[in-house]
Amino acid sequence: MWCTSGVGPYAVFAAYACTRCRNCIEVCPSYLATGDVLNTPMGRLQLVRKKAAADVLYRSFSLCTLCKRCAYFCPLGLDVAEVTRQVRDALTAAGRAVPYVAKVVNNFLRHGNNVGMPPRVVAMAARALVKKIVREKGAEPRLYLFDGERFTDALDGAEERPGERTALLFPSSSDLFEFEEAFRGYVYLLNLLGYDVVVSLRAADTANYGYYLNTQHMYKIAEMYLEEIRQVRPHVVVFGECGHGWHVFSRLVAPKSPSPVRHIHQLLFKEYSRGVLKIRRIEARQPVVYMDPCNYSRGAAPLTAEPRALLRAAVGDYVELWRNPRESVCCLGGGGL
């Protein structure tokens, strides 16, 4: 009885509602990669229905990327991503958490970012990036770092409060340490639009891996974002690029935020539509392809029109891989894969 008593009611409902029509099998990235029917939405639901042992559930549900693709091909709309979340709740409580996911969550809770960098290292990375903006653009970026008690200018390290028109930016930690062009673009564009940018050293990441671990930690990380918003009291909260992070943030953080929340795509699209943001088209040497992130096309707050409009303005024609954004295939980044 471990399974039915340990997982949430939606998981049990979906397990008994599944008609085993097999529509979900060929659309599941786990199945396409492994060829194992147990690594399909249908197979996973049958494991729940059969009250499978924890070890069996772990092997199958640890390979689900929570991409939600199955939900849009299922005649009943059964969302096995949510089933996976409820099963992982029970598995985590039983001591069977996915190790990588648990490590990332622990990094965020201890350091405020998923890669486990101490706040001083995050500050050093931010300072290095704003100096690159100075060299590239010849302008001094208005970026401030908040440590929970004071604001410092990222460029010279001096204690200084930002102006009244402030954007609290939650970037991806990978944008600070790997895809730094994205972070520099955030700061430069937000400055152009008249915002002083603040990055909290206590929550310098968009990704909420609690979504992949269990509900308790998902809410705990969401509350960390809310605490920074209350402390900084920005004019607007700007969320960087992260699919599942936006899915969770838009549901758990945005409704409780005392400041308006915008995804970076939403904010830039609005300013572009108003004519405030000018985008100069470039000549792409090779075809440009757009592939929707799972949680931009199938998440709680879809983002499909905005990135396409911005991409079209930047490169002109581009290639669509799918007839419908909701059909996009998962990149397998979800869940630590």
Please name every model-derived segment:
Residues W246-Q266:
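Short acidic, glycine/proline-enriched helix-loop-strand junctions
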Residues N23-P29, A33-D36, Y72-D79, G299, ...:
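Short functional micro-motifs and their immediate structural scaffolds
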Residues C18-C24, C67-C70, L332-L337:
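Cysteine-cluster motifs in flexible loop/terminal segments that predominantly coordinate metals
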Residues Y219-E227, L267-V276:
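Active-site glycine-rich loop that binds ribose-phosphate moieties when present
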Residues T4, P41, R274-L337:
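Redox cofactor-anchoring modules in respiratory/redox and cofactor-processing assemblies
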Residues M1-C64:
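Ferredoxin-type iron-sulfur electron-transfer modules and their immediate structural context
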Residues P171, H265, D292-C294:
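Short, structured patches in soluble enzyme cores that scaffold and shape functional sites
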